[in-house]
Amino acid sequence: RVLFRSDNYDLLPATIQLSGAEIELATQKQREYRLQKALMTVSDDYDFILIDNPPALGLLTVNAFTAADAILIPVQTEFYALEGLGQLLNTIELVRKQFNESLDIAGILLTMYDGRTNLAKQVSEEVRQYFGDKVYHTVVPRSVRLSEAPSYGQAIIDFDPKSIGAQVYTELAQEVLKQYGN
């Protein structure tokens, strides 16, 4: 159910009811295709449908990957993020082989970047070396305003339109639109 409508987007936030979805899905036939089937009923109403997944690689994420045309992968510029990225890539390959052979990686988005730290610079360089052109030019910095916006139930563009976070996500949107020819 859409809980927030604006001129440019609709928002369906996760609710507490989603917490039991993994358990419910586990016993259902064709469980990997449930989200795909649900989205088919509304896909013509939207130019893009973005699904923000939890960092876990369970049935909810597999459902999202099965339903998706492409994945935008956010990568925190921190050490353990590289480890998690390897696991994510393995899951993507499994989903491609078993459920969605056309699943594409749209790009890698570097997030929580703090240019004052050597680690952020090193992680950024490693990701760019490995993924090359798949890494978006836009980099999301660490930002207090970005971390505050969700607690007010708002996107950063609505919460603080002049903030660096809003500017960066606007740049990312433009980069993605250019990538997909819109």
Locations of the language-model features?
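Short, conserved glycine- and acidic-residue-centered signature motifs
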Residues: 28-31, 81-84, 165
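Conserved beta-strand scaffold positions in the cores of enzyme catalytic domains, especially
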Residues: 11, 135-139, 156
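Charged catalytic carboxylate motif
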Residues: 34, 87, 168
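P-loop/Walker-type NTP enzyme "switch/lid" segment
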Residues: 1-44, 99, 149-152
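Active-site donor-binding loop signature of nucleotide-sugar glycosyltransferases
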Residues: 14, 138, 142, 161
